[in-house]
Amino acid sequence: MEDVIARFENVLLIYHEPHAETLAIKDISIDFGRGNFTAIVGPSGCGKTTLLSILAGILPPSSGRVEVLGHTLYGDGSEDKRKCRSGAATGCDTGYMLQRDNLLDWRTIEDNVLLGLEIKHMLNDETRSYARELLRRYGLGDFMKLYPRQLSGGMRQKAALIRTLVFRPKLLLLDEPFSALDYQTKLLLADEVHSIIRREGCSAVLVTHDISEAISMCDRIIVLTSRPATVRCDVEIRLKEDSPLARRNDAGFKYYFNLVWEEMMKNEEFN
């Protein structure tokens, strides 16, 4: 892969406990292409969210090399390793969208979107104007003075995404952002979030348990094994449609679903 925005090279993670060690991730190597939307799927507890935490610079691996946006975050002799642990290497170029929206009930939607800018001392007339532009662009302009409790779950998650986008990130990490939503809202919001990410020109990595969601939203799916996690297979998705909703009706959708499902079924916990 020529244009790489992030890379794992032989990444290994061991959790050290008082009387035991647990091998969580074993020798994972993945290149994430710039401009691509990649999904990571696998059994519960296999290490999907752990990989996102490593990409975000939150969790150091036990060994191996990690590069994100041209910075060597982790690796022997890396000068950027210290920067990463202070959060400087990834900076605002990497955004993280969690399962929960984490909106503060006592702040308006606009003030919630501006919170990160305030914390990082980046709030000024220009960034405030850009935040309002994003709220209007993505259908929340009439709701920015309301409070989170007055919005639906889907609208709250969209506000959480905009809170991340105000930093103009180049890489978005999404940790099951639709899992708490009802099925209809989940489908509609996934379609809209996909469109927003494409329009904003971000690269993205999505962690999900939902194979259909992964196929409908992503260009590529990485299937992990049970713990200790390794890469079981790497599937490139080639469908004529780009919209997640339209992809679910694509003739090739079932082929990819069966392909990924069969790989998932090979995991030991299903045998």
Task: Name each model-derived stretch.
Residues 166-170:
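A short, proline-enriched helix->beta-strand linker immediately N-terminal to the Walker B motif
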Residues 114, 118, 125-143, 195:
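Conserved ABC ATPase "signature" region
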Residues 41-43:
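The feature captures the beta-strand-to-loop junction immediately N-terminal to the Walker
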Residues 64-75, 79-82, 86-90:
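Conserved ABC transporter NBD signature motif
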Residues 107-114:
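Short coil-to-helix segment of the ABC ATPase nucleotide-binding domain corresponding to the Q-loop/switch region
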Residues 147-151, 155:
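Conserved ABC ATPase signature
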Residues 56:
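Helix-to-loop junction immediately C-terminal to a conserved catalytic motif
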